[in-house]
């Protein structure tokens, strides 16, 4: 059980989860607001 905790706490796993969540967030933002290039002009 300790080996599983050690594996889940290493940086590649955490960075994969982080970048996956960030990619999902960016996809949802682009789905709700399709043209992000128009944001600076508001």
UniProtKB/Swiss-Prot annotation:
<feature type="transmembrane region" description="Helical">
    <location>
        <begin position="7"/>
        <end position="27"/>
    </location>
</feature>
<protein>
    <recommendedName>
        <fullName>Photosystem I reaction center subunit IX</fullName>
    </recommendedName>
</protein>
<keyword id="KW-1133">Transmembrane helix</keyword>
<comment type="subunit">
    <text>PSI consists of a core antenna complex that captures photons, and an electron transfer chain that converts photonic excitation into a charge separation. The eukaryotic PSI reaction center is composed of at least 11 subunits. Only detected in green leaves and not etioplasts; PSI is only assembled in green leaves.</text>
</comment>
<keyword id="KW-0934">Plastid</keyword>
<keyword id="KW-0150">Chloroplast</keyword>
<keyword id="KW-0603">Photosystem I</keyword>
<keyword id="KW-0793">Thylakoid</keyword>
<dbReference type="GO" id="GO:0015979">
    <property type="term" value="P:photosynthesis"/>
</dbReference>
<dbReference type="Pfam" id="PF01701">
    <property type="entry name" value="PSI_PsaJ"/>
</dbReference>
<dbReference type="InterPro" id="IPR036062">
    <property type="entry name" value="PSI_PsaJ_sf"/>
</dbReference>
<comment type="similarity">
    <text>Belongs to the PsaJ family.</text>
</comment>
<keyword id="KW-0472">Membrane</keyword>
<dbReference type="GO" id="GO:0009522">
    <property type="term" value="C:photosystem I"/>
</dbReference>
<keyword id="KW-0602">Photosynthesis</keyword>
<dbReference type="GO" id="GO:0009535">
    <property type="term" value="C:chloroplast thylakoid membrane"/>
</dbReference>
<keyword id="KW-0812">Transmembrane</keyword>
<comment type="function">
    <text>May help in the organization of the PsaE and PsaF subunits.</text>
</comment>
<dbReference type="InterPro" id="IPR002615">
    <property type="entry name" value="PSI_PsaJ"/>
</dbReference>
């Amino acid at each position: 059980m300790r080996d599983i905790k050690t594996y889940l706490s290493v940086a590649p796993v955490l960075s994969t989860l982080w970048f996956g969540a960030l990619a999902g967030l960016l996809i949802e933002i682009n789905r709700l607001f399709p043209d992000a290039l128009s944001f600076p002009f508001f």
